[in-house]
Every structure is written in C-alpha cells, then in structure tokens.
Amino acid sequence: MNYSLRSATIQDAPAVTACVNHAFGHYVERIGMKPAPMEMDYEHEIREHQVFVVEDAGQVVGSLVLGITQEGFLLDVIAVEPNYWSKGVGRIMLEHAEAEAKQQGFDSIYLFTHEKMVENQVLYKKVGYVEYDRRLEMGRNRVYMRKQLV
C-alpha cells in the first residue's frame, strides 16, 4: 500500500471524525462512555491545532492531532481505520509526531490514554513511552506516558 501523510484541511473534518469514531467505537462499552476523541470537534481541531491525515488512494485511513501544552508536546489523538490496523499507518503517524516535536524544539513527547485501553499502553511501551502519571479527568481515568526523543 502506498500511504501519504498530509496536513488536514477543514474539508477533511468529516473524514477525520469518521476515522476516530471507527477507531475508538469499540471502547465505548469497555469504558462505559465515549472515549474523549469521539467527543472532539475536528473542524475546531483542524483550525486550532496540528492535524494530519494518512490517505490510501485518496481515502483517509488515519488521523493525528498534535498540540502544545504546559506539559510539552502532546500527541493528542491517533486514530487508524480498523481495516488498516497492523498495516503501518499508526507507525507512520507516530514517527511523524516525533519528528514534529523535534522540529519544534522539544526533547520529549507525551500522550494519555484511558486506563482500560490496555492494548494501547502495551503498544506505546513497545515504542519507548514510559508511564509517568495517572489522573482522573473529565470522568476518565487516564494514564500519562512520555517518550524522550534523541
């Protein structure tokens, strides 16, 4: 497959929303509520933050939202269409997020995930993220993880 990554435009908002809903929908029952990414306004995110999409033959198959907070460079949302799981789309976006953080002068990148999304935590640990905090925010038990960049 020949994937391409590009900055998202306002016209991509519906496709980004659909991608996120498809990627996170199976967690609703497990955590007892919609995951936070499913409640975000992606038109707003595209206007205010760094949002990227991965396409395959012109179709959005992955989306990435990055931001800068008081804690540093945030990998806010990473979503892959389920039929593209384990096909390299997530890796492309993780590598891009790290490159963006470095380019903007950060020596680390952080993210958070719901404590019941254990497979995400395992994946992030495999690629170098280390848990550094747990917080209850917006009714969600979150695991914070950070990766040092070299």
PLM feature spans:
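Acetyl-CoA-dependent GNAT
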Residues: 3, 7-77, 81-83, 94-96, ...
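Short acidic donor-binding/metal-coordinating loop in glycosyltransferase active sites
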Residues: 80, 113, 141
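Flexible nucleotide-binding loop
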Residues: 87
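Accessory recognition modules or surfaces
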Residues: 91, 109-110, 144-148
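Conserved active-site alpha-helix within GNAT-family acetyltransferase domains
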Residues: 91, 103, 116-133, 138-141
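Conserved GNAT acetyl-CoA-binding A-motif
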Residues: 101-113
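Short low-complexity, flexible loop/linker segments enriched in glycine and/or proline
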Residues: 125-126, 147-149
